[in-house]
Amino acid sequence: SNIPYSLNVIIGMPFETREMVLDSARMVHQSKGYDGLTIGMMQFYHGTELRKIAVENEFLPDDYVNSGETEQGGGYLDHWAIEMPKPYLQESDVHRLVKTFALYAYFDESRWDEVYQSETDETLYKKLMDEYQREFFSDIQQGGKDRILNKTCAKHEVTSTYEWEVLT
């Protein structure tokens, strides 16, 4: 089909490691035709199974309510609450990976050392983001098929593109 769509990635699940996040970036890189990518931090809402897992493993106090000095807009999108032992993600990892995930997902792995450096180097981050935005963003929303044919999603050969059809 030629319907525009976006991919959504959540970072910071209980027991998640940096390598798991990079596996998600690899999966997004292999995806074809998306015209948007949304990355968010995991939020542990009351009554959810993932909050229960975080509490049972003592990553999150049972009475936790989302709040903190760093939150903006109610803290729902930029405040990560759990504390896990290494090798699992740490708060600083989550913030850096949310910031740079689109770069990991867009660029080939041969450039991931640069992306890793950009997690803490703002000048390099801006340079890579400028390149990403120039190549990926378009003035209009495109459908998946158009985006693939114009090669403005992660780099793919048109011959490897799946043909989609709507069955009624």
Describe every region a protein language model picked out:
Residues 1-50, 100-115:
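Conserved C-terminal portion of the radical SAM core fold
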Residues 4, 14, 61, 85-87:
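Proline-rich intrinsically disordered, low-complexity coils
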Residues 11, 58, 82-84:
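Compositionally biased, intrinsically disordered/low-complexity regions enriched for serine, proline
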Residues 24, 52-59:
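Short secondary-structure boundary/capping segments
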Residues 49-54, 63-168:
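Radical SAM enzyme core and accessory elements
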